[in-house]
Every structure is written in structure tokens, then in C-alpha cells.
Design a protein with these regions (language model features):
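N-terminal Rossmann-like FAD-binding beta1-loop-alpha1 element of flavoenzymes
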Residues: 92-117
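An anion/pyrophosphate-binding glycine-rich loop and adjacent beta-alpha core
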Residues: 1-21, 301, 307-375
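Glycine-rich active-site loop/strand segments that organize a redox cofactor
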Residues: 137-168
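Glycine-rich phosphate/pyrophosphate-binding loops
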Residues: 114-121, 278-287, 297-299, 303-321
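Residue-level detector of alpha-helix initiation sites
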Residues: 98-100, 122, 213, 278
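Glycine-rich FAD pyrophosphate-binding loop
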Residues: 109-132, 141
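Conserved redox-cofactor binding core of oxidoreductases
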Residues: 44-63, 69, 181-262, 267, ...
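Extreme N-terminal leader/targeting segments of oxidoreductases
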Residues: 1-91
Length: 375
């Protein structure tokens, strides 16, 4: 299965295993991390970025792949669709059938709204399904949302929007409770206590997992809840443009049935964009574990109507994935393997970094090892 070159490396890794057992690589200083990121992290490659020429983020920079999408013209011509002919009329239109979209639809339905999900693939075909390691929430006695906030704020180099990060950490325990009550089978002790583990850059064990298929289990539960509630789901139908009313408020979307090629009109009092990110656009040519649907569709829809993008100049490069064999190139290797003891080693069998550094530092360390150090 392995190439001769790989087998040589495997032998070196095996030969150094005994010396690594029980050792803990030192953590980098803040200065070392900053220098490492500047030299090796993809977000610092000036040649990979272009200036945005139009829209609310005009004058700012983003990865070239995203900028080209932001500069693109709509595929919709006025003679393609009759806006007076309404095909769907609902209170809430949710665009996107992943974890966020399903959750939004469930909550809207619980509040009594007439809600519909539209997704360009199938419900559940999303990055939520691809997640393996777990979801973090400070719900143990030795932890708190304040500590979670500090870990996350520092791990993000103090660039996070405080109000958004506060909402994340304060509501995370309730989100875990909600998912648990819906039926998500989190890992638990015999007495029912949830098992938690460390994640990269965390000072407390707050990672809640479902074995190594956390996202699939969460999506299974959400999908079942959507079906059990009878929430309509229009699959293989993409939103190609948002519609505004005479008050300039979003009032629905033009949809494209990807099987028939027909354009459809959905009218809604509220539109929720839950289409995920841009990870499948292969920024800077990197392989990706992102789902095929993560192609920035919703970002472009919102941007064309004046919604500014946040953090458009950065993207998370997950440190660990499959490089061989080619059939699963780019598949995710979850952070959880490092949280329970796995080390990152180079081709010489040397542990070159602490296994629980933050993801940006870990990714930059791996890139340095493979390029500058040639290991």
C-alpha cells in the first residue's frame, strides 16, 4: 500500500516511538507563533489576495478565488422569470440544508411559523456532516463561558467580534442541551455524564463528541426532526438571487431547479441564509475536507444586496488531513486524535510541535516542516 519512500519514513517513526512516549513537546512562545504565522501561514501570502472593487467591502482584500465570485455578474436575466407568479409562499424561507439551516427551520417551526427549506443538494449534504471531532461548550464545574471566551479570543489573536464571541460561548451550553434533548447520542459515562476532551488551544476539556462521527450524528438527529415535524424541504434547487420588495426589504428568492432547469419564485416574510462558507473553492490550491456544497453561494447572494462580509480575508486551514492514498486525498483527520494523545511527527520521526496548539499555528508548523525544513 505504501510507497518505498513512505516505508522508509514509517520505519523512522517506529524507531523513535519509544523516545516520544511520555514526552510532551514544549509550547511555542507568543513571539514564536507570530513569526511562524507571518512566514508560513497561507493567510499571510500577499500574492494570494486581491482588492475587492465593488460592494460593501470595496477597498478591502480577500482571497482571489472569492474576489472573482464577488465581481461576477448574476446568471439571472429578467426574461428568465416572472416575479408575479409565486411558486412558494411562506413565512420563513431557509436557504441551506445543513446543520444551521435545519436548526433554524426547527426553531422557526417551534415558534409557529410556516417554514420551508431549500437546498441545492439534499438535506444533510453539508459541512456539518463532514465534522468528526466534536463541539465545544463550557458546561462542566471546572469551566465557564468566561474561560471559554478567553481561550477563543486569544486563539483568534484577539480579532474576533466580542459581541459575536460572547453570544457563542454563552449559548453553547444551551445548544448542547438542546441537541441532547433532540436525541444526539453524545459520548457519556455510565452515569450519563457527558465525556469531554481537550481541543487545540483550550485550557479546559470542553469538547463534546459522538465517537468520531459527531457531525454525522448531529445531522442525523436534525434531519429526523425536520422530517418528523413535516417541514417542507425542496432539494436539488439552488437560490440564484434574492428578491426585494418596494420597501427595499428582502422578500424571497428566485430558485433554480437543478434537475429541470426551471426558475421558481419563493415569497417569504423572512429569509435566512444558512449556506455555509467557501471552503470548497480550494483557496490557494489547497486540498479540502469541505463538502462539495461549500462554494460561497449564500455569501454572494447577501453581498449583492449590500450585506458586508466579515473576516473575508481569512479562512481556517485545518492542520491534519489525508495525503495518501489519492482516493481519499484531502479527507479530514480530526483534531480529536491529538486531543487523546497523538503527536505530529515529520518524516524523520521527530515530534516538531505541541499537539494541541491552535489550528493556525499547527497548520503553519506543518507547512514549515514540509517546505523550509524539507521533512
Amino acid at each position: 500500500m505504501f510507497t518505498p519512500e513512505m516505508m522508509e519514513s514509517v520505519k523512522k517513526v517506529e524507531a523513535t516511538r519509544a523516545s516520544r512516549l511520555g514526552m510532551e513537546p514544549r509550547r511555542m512562545t507568543a513571539e514564536e507563533k507570530d513569526q511562524l504565522l507571518r512566514e508560513f501561514h497561507p493567510d499571510y501570502r500577499a500574492e494570494a489576495f486581491e482588492e475587492i472593487k465593488v460592494g460593501p467591502n470595496k477597498g478591502q482584500k480577500a482571497n482571489k478565488e472569492l474576489v472573482h465570485m464577488l465581481h461576477s455578474n448574476s446568471r439571472l436575466l429578467k426574461d428568465h422569470v416572472d416575479l408575479s407568479k409565486i411558486d412558494y409562499d411562506v413565512d420563513v424561507l431557509v436557504i441551506g440544508g445543513g446543520g444551521a439551516g435545519a436548526s433554524a427551520a426547527i426553531e422557526a417551526h417551534e415558534a409557529g411559523a410556516d417554514v420551508m427549506i431549500v437546498t441545492k443538494l439534499r438535506i444533510g449534504d453539508a459541512n456539518t456532516m463532514m465534522a468528526e471531532g466534536g463541539i465545544q461548550a463550557a458546561d462542566k464545574e471546572n469551566d465557564s463561558p468566561v474561560q471559554h471566551y478567553l481561550d477563543a479570543f486569544g486563539g483568534g489573536h484577539f480579532a474576533a467580534r466580542p459581541e459575536l464571541l460572547k453570544k457563542l460561548v454563552m449559548e453553547a451550553p444551551d445548544a448542547i442541551k438542546w441537541l441532547n434533548e433532540l436525541g444526539v447520542m453524545f459520548d457519556k459515562d455510565a452515569d450519563g455524564t457527558m465525556i469531554t476532551t481537550h481541543g487545540g488551544g483550550t485550557s479546559r476539556k470542553r469538547m463534546h463528541a459522538c465517537k468520531d462521527y459527531s457531525g454525522a450524528e448531529i445531522m442525523r438527529t436534525l434531519r429526523d426532526e425536520v422530517i418528523n415535524r413535516g417541514i417542507p424541504v425542496v432539494e436539488f434547487t439552488s437560490a440564484v438571487e434574492l428578491i426585494r420588495d418596494e420597501k427595499n426589504q428582502v422578500a424571497g428568492a428566485v430558485l433554480l431547479n437543478m434537475e429541470t432547469g426551471d426558475y421558481l419564485v419563493a415569497r417569504a416574510k423572512t429569509v435566512i441564509i444558512a449556506t455555509g462558507g467557501a471552503g470548497r473553492m480550494h483557496y490557494q490550491g489547497f486540498a479540502t475536507s469541505n463538502h462539495y456544497g461549500a462554494t460561497a453561494d449564500g455569501l454572494i447572494l447577501g453581498y449583492r444586496l449590500g450585506a458586508p462580509l466579515l473576516y473575508q480575508d481569512t479562512i481556517q486551514y485545518h492542520p491534519t488531513g489525508v495525503a495518501y492514498p489519492a482516493q481519499i486525498f484531502g479527507a479530514l483527520v480530526t483534531e480529536k486524535v491529538r486531543s487523546i494523545g497523538a503527536m505530529l511527527v515529520n518524516s524523520e520521526g521527530e515530534a516538531f510541535m505541541h499537539p494541541l496548539e491552535t489550528r493556525d499555528v499547527s497548520a503553519a508548523s506543518i507547512i514549515r516542516e514540509c517546505t523550509a525544513r524539507g521533512k
